[in-house]
Amino acid sequence: MSFLDDEKWTGRVFTGSWERAAGGDAAVIEPATGDELGRVGIASPQDLAASAAKAAEAQRAWAATSFQERAAVLRRAGDLWQQHAAELKDWLIRESGSIPGKADFELHVAAQECYEAAALPSHPTGEVLPSEAPRLSMARRVPAGVVGVIAPFNAPLILSIRSVAPALALGNSVVLKPDPRTAVCGGVALARVFEEAGLPAGVLHVLPGGPDVGAALVEDKHVRVISFTGSTAAGRAVGESAGRHLKRAHLELGGNSALIVLDDADLEQAMSAAAWGSFFHQGQICMTTGRHLVHASLYDEYVDRLADKASHLPVGNPFTEQVALGPIIDAKQRDKIHGLVTSSVDAGAKVAAGGTYEDLFYRATVLAGAGPSVPAYDQEVFGPVAPVAKFTSLDEAAKLASESEYGLSLGIITADVAKGLALADRIPTGIAHINDQTVNDEALAPFGGVFDSGTGSRFGGPAANIEAFTETRWVTMRGDVAGYPF
């Protein structure tokens, strides 16, 4: 029997056991072929309510377990990602359209997230405070309770596990709503891993579903923290609802990240980073390089080199062919990408490479003559499109990079590292890389953006995870009962 044997999960949701979904089921479609890979259970709002109540009950016992027990579950989970990597890799390639290297990276990060989370239960937290009274005064970190996680399709495993693992390690229970398009990699796989790792029943729930289930998750009285990754528009709705219900929402949203190429850059070295930043996973990453800002002295050569590289990147089925780009997730997303490309041409940009597609396979595209007022430059494309604009001074580069509603990632290519860091300090983003492109992720590194990219670094590393998934409680102790003049 395979680890992801569909007899377990077909038409079911995970609530500590595999139960029939009240919302029916939906096809799991392979974007590259249109083939049906299985049928995943779709939760209803009623399923969500039942799971949230069950999770709240299970959380109390889970929080009371020793830190050694919780750490052991997370370590076993990390081992399981590695033990079943071959099968899980195939699912990532087929369900999400990942090339093999991207699937390997997701599995590596999933294991690392669990191993890092395994250190959280024994991580020293809290403070001993001075007190005006003769007593011991402390600030302690305690579990938040039930954590709701809403994860997207593009990196389904990473963007689920980075919240699920630390939340569980810190004594919370979790209700996870993966995107139905990638519900196996972003949901079923996590349920199976933690089921086999020995997580007590009821502590993790996996409920694929639509917007109605997401809304019910945010509104449910048992859920105290929401961790959401997705579009800025959807994130606004989540944040507004969470605010009305007086609960915290950690929002990791869209981006339109800039890669700045200074006049002293080595273009031979820069090309690999530039292409990777815009075309990795078909540009379907929040950190994707959405704007290439190139010094005027290098601009023409940069466009020519990037267009040449883009035109030689093979596109096709990553499960059966050796390709650099796989499929776009679905026709709706492909049409959005192409609409932005065509409207950008109408606005004056020139297609230097790509700009065409077959089925869901969109070719790596370079748009020369881009800049403010060009749609693919101004907006998040979420596709393999590289708009290239020019600047003539550091001041202009900083101004152009900062003129965005987003503030997620930034890359700067330069021979002068100090100059690059000084420029980065002038541009408000949550992430900055000197001599690297914009797409980077590590389990230990704080991750998040500013402005319309989200509510800051709430993922990655012990400090961010403890802040995200615990509450601070003030506790005092004294040997005698305090007396008062009443």
Swiss-Prot record:
Pfam families registered for this protein in UniProt: Aldedh (PF00171)
The entry's NAD(+)-binding residues are 210-211, 230-231, 252-254, 380-382
Q: Which controlled-vocabulary keywords does the entry list?
A: NAD, Oxidoreductase
Q: What is its EC number?
A: 1.2.1.67
Highest rank taxon of the organism: Bacteria
Residues at the catalytic site: 252 (proton acceptor), 286 (nucleophile)
Enumerate the SUPFAM superfamilies for this protein: ALDH-like
Which GO terms fall under molecular function for this chain's record?
oxidoreductase activity, acting on the aldehyde or oxo group of donors, NAD or NADP as acceptor
Q: How does activity depend on temperature?
A: Optimum temperature is 44 degrees Celsius for the NAD(+)-dependent oxidation of vanillin. Active between 15-65 degrees Celsius. Retains 86% of the activity after storage at 4 degrees Celsius for 24 hours.
Question: What biotechnological or industrial uses does this protein have?
Answer: Vanillin is toxic to the cells and hence it is subject to catabolism caused by the oxidative activity of this protein. This is undesired from the production point of view of this important compound. The deletion mutant of this protein can be used in production of natural vanillin by microbial fermentation from ferulic acid at final concentrations and molar yields on an industrial scale.
The annotated site for Transition state stabilizer falls at: 154
The UniProt entry, under Gene3D superfamilies, shows:
Aldehyde Dehydrogenase, Chain A, domain 1 (3.40.605.10), Aldehyde Dehydrogenase, Chain A, domain 2 (3.40.309.10)
> What is this protein's expression induced by?
By vanillin and ferulic acid.
Stated pH dependence: Optimum pH is 8.0 for the NAD(+)-dependent oxidation of vanillin. Active between pH 5.0-9.0.
Knockout: what is the outcome?
No growth on vanillin and no vanillin dehydrogenase activity. Degrades ferulic acid in a similar way to wild-type. The deletion mutant produces higher vanillin concentration being provided ferulic acid for the synthesis of vanillin as the mutant is only very slowly oxidized to vanillate.
Q: Which reaction does it catalyse?
A: vanillin + NAD(+) + H2O = vanillate + NADH + 2 H(+)
InterPro entries, alphabetized: Ald_DH/histidinol_DH, Ald_DH_C, Ald_DH_CS_GLU, Ald_DH_N, Aldehyde_DH_dom
Any idea what job this protein has? Catalyzes NAD(+)-dependent oxidation of vanillin to vanillate. Also oxidizes other aromatic aldehydes including benzaldehyde, coniferyl aldehyde and cinnamaldehyde, but has a preference for vanillin. Not active with NADP(+). Involved in the degradation pathway of lignin-derived aromatic compounds of plant cell walls. Catalyzes the conversion of vanillin to vanillate due to toxicity of vanillin to the cells.
- UniProt similarity note: Belongs to the aldehyde dehydrogenase family.
Q: What is this protein called?
A: Vanillin dehydrogenase
